[in-house]
Amino acid sequence: VSLVMNNKKGVSEETRRRVMSVVEECGYAPALQKKKVERFRLMVLKFRAHGIALEENQGFIASIIDRIESECRRFAFDLVMCNCEAKTAENTIRELMQNPPDGVIVIGTELREPDYPLLRLFTVPVVVLDNNIILDNIDSVVMANRALMANVVHYLYDLGYREIGYFKFTQPVNNCDERYEGYLAELE
């Protein structure tokens, strides 16, 4: 009966007709099998070089990850989180691409220009957050850091302040470098 119902070989035509006749007489209708639905798998990779920028901005980074998680749930995407240390990043990315997700969002706050070639190791679409990556086929989402700092300096100047200082990380962070450039440009 199973061979007939699943339209398999190994059953004579006469037996096949008799089985189908009984099936129709009894009004049997096979249950529709649910097809396994492939879910979109998204990975969030948090790139860590020195940890200072990530640690000092935990609330900001957590809010980004929370929102990504919320949207993945809303669209029934599977979300995979991965921490990636700069010194082992190449091996980590190569290993991840053995069973690649459908897309990757890189928290790139601590990515520096020498790290950019690592992004080419991804074999799936990539978006970098919190770093203005200028690299072929890599999109990024970042604040307008220079304009932001220029606006702050301009605002303080309009309030009457003439000696405006700037604090920045001792470790290199692209966002901070861009903000510093905006600060210096507005002071001129």
For the regions a protein language model found, what residue spans apply to each?
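N-terminal helix-turn-helix DNA-binding module of bacterial transcription factors
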Residues: 2-39
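Surface-exposed alpha-helical interface segments used for non-catalytic interactions
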Residues: 13, 17, 66, 154, ...
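Alpha-helical structural signal in soluble globular domains
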Residues: 22, 67-71, 118, 178-188
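Short acidic/polar active-site loop segments enriched in Thr and Asp
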Residues: 29, 102, 161-163
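A short, charged/proline- and glycine-enriched loop
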Residues: 37-42, 160
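Alpha-helical recognition/docking segments in bacterial nutrient-uptake
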Residues: 40-154
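An alpha-beta-alpha
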Residues: 152-187
